[in-house]
């Protein structure tokens, strides 16, 4: 019986791992990221961009997949007031990359997702000759496991973002009450 349970657990882990994808990989199915998401963690090599009142402290509510673009619906908090912000990200020539104009020119990819629970995004912003990067961890639910959060932190470090520049927003005002 124990062997059967271990076998089932092993097969479950293999199936879960096999379902992970990257927007730059051949197995990525953009349709599966359609729907509701929650911002869990933001990270940046310019921390001030994601701190309170930072221009990139955006709380994702929804991704709507179109043929060659994504409609992204966010909320921002300014002076404790929630505001809605929508933008359209267009596919670029590079596989799995999207671009959007917001406080500069941005390109982003989705290095990891399992579609059902989490999505990890990597964004590069260019404005006035300066560049910074931002990474986001998003969940289908308002919070994620510590294991997924740790995997995200390691991915941030691989991109040169220090742990002190990773902000867990799962307990912050993310305008959850403003969701329809």
UniProtKB/Swiss-Prot annotation:
Its main location: secreted. Abundant in the urine of adult male mice but absent from that of females. Disulfide bonds join 82-175. It holds the Pfam family Lipocalin. Binds pheromones that are released from drying urine of males. These pheromones affect the sexual behavior of females. One of its GO terms (molecular function) is small molecule binding. GO terms for biological process: aerobic respiration; cellular response to lipid; energy reserve metabolic process; glucose homeostasis; heat generation; locomotor rhythm; mitochondrion organization; negative regulation of DNA-templated transcription. The gene is Mup2. Belongs to the calycin superfamily. Lipocalin family. The keyword Nucleus does not apply. One of its GO terms (cellular component) is nucleus. This is Major urinary protein 2. Gene3D superfamilies: 2.40.128.20. It is found in: Secreted. Keywords: Disulfide bond, Pheromone-binding, Secreted, Signal, Transport. Residues 1-18 form the signal peptide. InterPro entries: Calycin, Lipocalin, Lipocalin_CS, Lipocln_cytosolic_FA-bd_dom, Maj_urinary.
């Amino acid at each position: 019986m124990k062997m059967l349970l271990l076998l089932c657990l092993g097969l479950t882990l293999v199936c879960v791992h096999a379902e992970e994808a990257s927007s730059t990989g051949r197995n990525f199915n953009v349709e599966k990221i359609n729907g509701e998401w929650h911002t869990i963690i933001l990270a940046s090599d310019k921390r001030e961009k994601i701190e309170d009142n930072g221009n990139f402290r955006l709380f994702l509510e929804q991704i709507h997949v179109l043929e060659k673009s994504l409609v992204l619906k966010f909320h921002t908090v300014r002076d404790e007031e929630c505001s809605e912000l929508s933008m359209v990200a267009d596919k670029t020539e590079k596989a799995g990359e999207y671009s959007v104009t917001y406080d500069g020119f941005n390109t982003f990819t989705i290095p990891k997702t399992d579609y059902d629970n989490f999505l990890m995004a990597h964004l590069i912003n260019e404005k006035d000759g300066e560049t910074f990067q931002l990474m986001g961890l998003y969940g289908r639910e308002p919070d994620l496991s510590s294991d997924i959060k740790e995997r995200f932190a390691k991915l941030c470090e691989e991109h040169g973002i220090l742990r002190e520049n990773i902000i867990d927003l799962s307990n912050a005002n993310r305008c959850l009450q403003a969701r329809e």
